Structure formats: structure tokens, C-alpha cells
């Protein structure tokens, strides 16, 4: 269910604002989105895993907070661009 360090590094390279950017909200949203998609695939097989479902809801809440921060700090344009890149929402 967790993502590999190679996958994290590739996400960091794609969504980083500057070189060696590991903690920006853009990178964290990308990593959280990957974890959420992995858990979603897990639930297609294990429908009754309620313990992990709580973890999924926590991850979704964290991503929502980062997205709100991006929208507030960097503007609606950066927010919409990130959502399109990640493939979430409308």
C-alpha cells in the first residue's frame, strides 16, 4: 500500500518548485494523491477493510488542507493547474 522511494523521487522531480524540493505543498499533494489512489485500488479487492478506510479519509483531509493552502497562497490558477496535473476533481 505504501509507495516506493523511487516513485516518491519521480513525483518530487515532476512537482518540485525548485531543485531539491521535498516538502512543498505541491509535492506533498502529489505524494498524497498517489497514496490515495493506491488505497482506492486496495478497496476494490478488500471491501470490508474499515480500518484502512479511516486512514484513507485522513489522507484525503490532509490533501484537502494542502490544496486549500495552495489556492490561498499561490492563487486559483496554480490550484487549477495542479488539480489538472494530478487528475483529481472535475
Curated annotation (Swiss-Prot):
| Family affiliation | Belongs to the universal ribosomal protein uS15 family.
Q: What is the lineage of its organism?
A: Bacteria, Pseudomonadati, Pseudomonadota, Alphaproteobacteria, Rickettsiales
Source species, domain of life: Bacteria
Q: Give a GO cellular-component term.
A: cytosolic small ribosomal subunit
> A Gene Ontology molecular-function term?
structural constituent of ribosome
- Supply the Gene3D superfamilies for this chain: 6.10.250.3130, S15/NS1, RNA-binding
- PANTHER family, alphabetically? RIBOSOMAL PROTEIN S15, BACTERIAL AND ORGANELLAR (PTHR23321), SMALL RIBOSOMAL SUBUNIT PROTEIN US15M (PTHR23321:SF26)
User: Which SUPFAM superfamilies does the UniProt entry name for this protein?
Assistant: S15/NS1 RNA-binding domain (SSF47060)
Its function? One of the primary rRNA binding proteins, it binds directly to 16S rRNA where it helps nucleate assembly of the platform of the 30S subunit by binding and bridging several RNA helices of the 16S rRNA. Forms an intersubunit bridge (bridge B4) with the 23S rRNA of the 50S subunit in the ribosome.
Summarize the subunit comment: Part of the 30S ribosomal subunit. Forms a bridge to the 50S subunit in the 70S ribosome, contacting the 23S rRNA.
Key word Ribonucleoprotein present: yes
The UniProt keywords, alphabetically, are: Ribonucleoprotein, Ribosomal protein, RNA-binding, rRNA-binding
Q: Does the keyword Transmembrane helix apply?
A: no
Protein's name according to its UniProt entry: Small ribosomal subunit protein uS15
Pfam families in UniProt: Ribosomal_S15
Q: Which organism is it from?
A: Wolbachia pipientis wMel
What GO biological process terms does the UniProt entry carry, in alphabetical order? Answer: translation
Amino acid at each position: 500500500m505504501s509507495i516506493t522511494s523511487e516513485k516518491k523521487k519521480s513525483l518530487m522531480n515532476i512537482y518540485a518548485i525548485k531543485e531539491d524540493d521535498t516538502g512543498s505543498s505541491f509535492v506533498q499533494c502529489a505524494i498524497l494523491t498517489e497514496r490515495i489512489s493506491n488505497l482506492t485500488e486496495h478497496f476494490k479487492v478488500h471491501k470490508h477493510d474499515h480500518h484502512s478506510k479511516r486512514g484513507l479519509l485522513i489522507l484525503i483531509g490532509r490533501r484537502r488542507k494542502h490544496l486549500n493552502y495552495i489556492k490561498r497562497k499561490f492563487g486559483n490558477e496554480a490550484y487549477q493547474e495542479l488539480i489538472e496535473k494530478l487528475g483529481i476533481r472535475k
